[in-house]
Amino acid sequence: MSAKEIRFSNDARDRLLRGVELLNNAVKVTLGPKGRNVVIDKAYGAPRITKDGVSVAKEIELADKFENMGAQMVREVASKTNDLAGDGTTTATVLAASIFREGAKLVAAGMNPMDLRRGIDLGVTAVVKEIKARAMKVKSSSEIAQVGTIAANGDAAIGEMIAKAMDKVGNEGVITVEEARTAETELDVVEGMQFDRGYLSPYFVTNAEKMRVELEDPYILVHEKKLGSLQAMLPILEAVVQTGKPLLLISEDVEGEALATLVVNKLRGGLKVAAVKAPGFGDRRKAMLEDIAVLTSGQMISEDLGIKLDNVTLDMLGHAKRVLIDKESTTIIDGSGEKAAIQARIQQIKAQIEETTSDYDKEKLQERLAKLAGGVAVIRVGGATETEVKEKKDRIDDALNATRAAVEEGIVPGGGVALLRAKSALTGLTGENADVTAGISIVLRALEAPIRQIADNAGFEGSIVVGKLAGSNNHNQGFDAQTETYVDMIEAGIVDPAKVVRTALQDAGSIAALLITAEVMIADIPARDSAPAAGNGGMGDMGY
């Protein structure tokens, strides 16, 4: 075990504070509409240019181990805020640095760190309650666009694109962001359920020009196992032929003789048919097949359920208005499933999302939910260079997360105004002793930090801006750094999601309060470079 270096009390907190300030100084320049970009060197490829606070924070690693501990703790604030709210990472960093800076001063002056921490917790709880009380529900598509525009650094085109996407697929729908192959940024909406499995044979194609299968009003057979022979299916195939409708066959795989028989029937015109592999793997495949069955009002043919292929009747098959299949994907449009059954399935998936602790499982469940609930929208991000595309993609990700948070918990005035006005919740609030009350006053001062930083980044004196707003009776009055004027933030469309503001303060207060209570720091002593090897062993005395 290597030797350790130990630091105590004020010396320890000073080193922590130095690390916190270094990280904060790198991140805070990105705050607000006139915030600057940060250029990050990469081990390979072009440098990355970003205005995303958490991306900057994640790149910072300091040489001094004690300073690095402080930086890493605040980096944790940015990451946690990003995970919970998806935006507000720079605000969280600025708040954490302000709370820790003031707290460290008071501890150095002889106040009790544990009482200060209690005061900070009291202050944060009161402010969060105030923010929740003042939040306004998002009512229209234009309000969603406003939230997206602010989070995308004032890019109205991005805000409108996200609002359009949410309008098409609903609040539960999946909106994904991908890199485009062109210079244009565009929105592509897939209605109905789409999964990433294409036709098993190009002979199934009905539209040769677009190389895709188009089935109108088809029956859908959902089968769990592989199909090697069609012997057991003959009764149901004959029943489908009698109706004159097409058939889509979804199963684990269709092999050899079975596939050849289907292709021959299709080419001879006896049966309009197409076959695709089932999406997913293992248990997830079974769940997705059940989703398709619910969506199309059919039954999954599974021996686990006691249903065999030779017993299948027409009423066990699913049904949809239209099915489109290309080489890589299958889209089922307007399935005839009952609304109540689909809604029950949606609630079941939502319950699973609440229970799961795995991010990967959560993401896959969200995808299933979206496919049942509304559809999928894809924003394809274009740009002149790869660096520009990546920077734009960061902003769209932030905007997307912000709009989802706004729909969830409502909106508050943006530009740091919500936190500044929430100071009223702390007026007259005192603790059980002077040190706890001092902890509350730390939060009171920190609430001004974001708006001061936004003003500083716009070239204004933060103190003057805060002073001017303090004299206004309009709770929505704020400083628009873009136009450099004082406006009603709600009327001007400068809004923040309440969830983002609340999460930023809670995470910042939690980590900063912990840092204040740190009394001892322990780190490995850096290993000295070993001395160079002294010549060839055993050859030293040979007189050469």
From Swiss-Prot:
Keywords: ATP-binding, Chaperone, Cytoplasm, Isomerase, Nucleotide-binding. It is found in: Cytoplasm. ATP binds at residues 30-33, 51, 87-91, 415, 496. The keyword Nucleotide-binding applies. It comes from the Bacteria. GO terms for cellular component: cytoplasm. GO terms for molecular function: ATP binding; ATP-dependent protein folding chaperone; isomerase activity; unfolded protein binding. Its EC number is 5.6.1.7. It catalyses: ATP + H2O + a folded polypeptide = ADP + phosphate + an unfolded polypeptide. GO terms for biological process: protein refolding. Pfam families: Cpn60_TCP1. Together with its co-chaperonin GroES, plays an essential role in assisting protein folding. The GroEL-GroES system forms a nano-cage that allows encapsulation of the non-native substrate proteins and provides a physical environment optimized to promote and accelerate protein folding. Belongs to the chaperonin (HSP60) family. HAMAP family: CH60. NCBIfam families: GroEL, PRK00013.1, PRK12849.1, PRK12850.1, PRK12851.1. This is Chaperonin GroEL 3. It comes from Rhizobium leguminosarum.
